[in-house]
UniProtKB/Swiss-Prot annotation:
Catalyzes the prenylation of para-hydroxybenzoate (PHB) with an all-trans polyprenyl group. Mediates the second step in the final reaction sequence of ubiquinone-8 (UQ-8) biosynthesis, which is the condensation of the polyisoprenoid side chain with PHB, generating the first membrane-bound Q intermediate 3-octaprenyl-4-hydroxybenzoate. Keywords: Cell inner membrane, Cell membrane, Magnesium, Membrane, Transferase, Transmembrane, Transmembrane helix, Ubiquinone biosynthesis. InterPro entries: HB_polyprenyltransferase-like, Prenyltransferase, UbiA_prenyltransferase, UbiA_prenylTrfase_CS, UbiA_sf. Signal peptide: none annotated. GO terms for molecular function: 4-hydroxybenzoate polyprenyltransferase activity. This is 4-hydroxybenzoate octaprenyltransferase. The lineage of its organism: Bacteria, Pseudomonadati, Pseudomonadota, Gammaproteobacteria, Pseudomonadales. It comes from Azotobacter vinelandii (strain DJ / ATCC BAA-1303). One of its GO terms (biological process) is ubiquinone biosynthetic process. It is a multi-pass membrane protein. Its EC number is 2.5.1.39.
Amino acid sequence: MYTALLQSMNRLHPRAWDFIQLVRLDRPIGIYLLLWPTLWAVWIAADGSPSLKHVLIFTCGVILMRSAGCVINDFADRNFDGHVARTRQRPLATGRIRTREAWALFAVLVALSFGLVLLTDPFTVALSFGALAVASLYPFMKRYTHLPQLVLGAAYSWGIPMAFTAATGRLPLEAWLIFAANLAWTVAYDTYYAMTDREDDLKIGVKSTAILFGAADRAIILALQGLTLGLLLVVGMRLGLGPYFHLGLLVAALCFAWEFVTTRRREPQACFRAFLHNHWAGLAILVGLILDYGI
């Protein structure tokens, strides 16, 4: 139904679907994976009572910046995507969208995002430039390092300190603990994602943690997910969070265990399902937080 609704946008413009695919609105998993930890920070920074203004700013900002990130990613990969089965039909790879059109869309998305951050405070505005820099850098890192997922982790975690500065004007230790937890989690789930393309990436020279970790990939992913839960547990202890938060962490742990078991044969589709499944872990933690503060 959601996809059909997006495809109906072609009635407004014959190329609408191409641009929807470019910004991945047809695949909202990236929005979820970026949104849940950002909202963890929004709730914790506001001691469980965030303003509607901040919830809307960060939710809309996530959607816009994730879309901008997809555009710059596809621009960077336009000469590689045609050689990978999963990506060869992307609009820039096929030429359905021209590079100058992609750059124009990227500029519009970034401008809209900046308009949102201007509704906060100078400290948060200053941090937003770092967010743009890291998000723009990530797509090019896979050419030079086996750790592009680490840069993606920083990009996907940048909204966390911004949420704290917007709500409190400062960056307490909890902000950095959540940042580190989310960075570890992002590296973990994006390694599952990279495992789906590992054979193609080896052929074309694209680097990733999936290639770097080799046969230890699943064990390292599980360790990173354990680190995520451990750091969040420390946050919970420091803030005196209660049983609902810990229940959310338990549900997340069960999600991680399921992913570990189902990827034992490293089949690409199983790895991709494990990647998708991670958003349920993030949502469980958010629901636990909201319930813990609200009850």
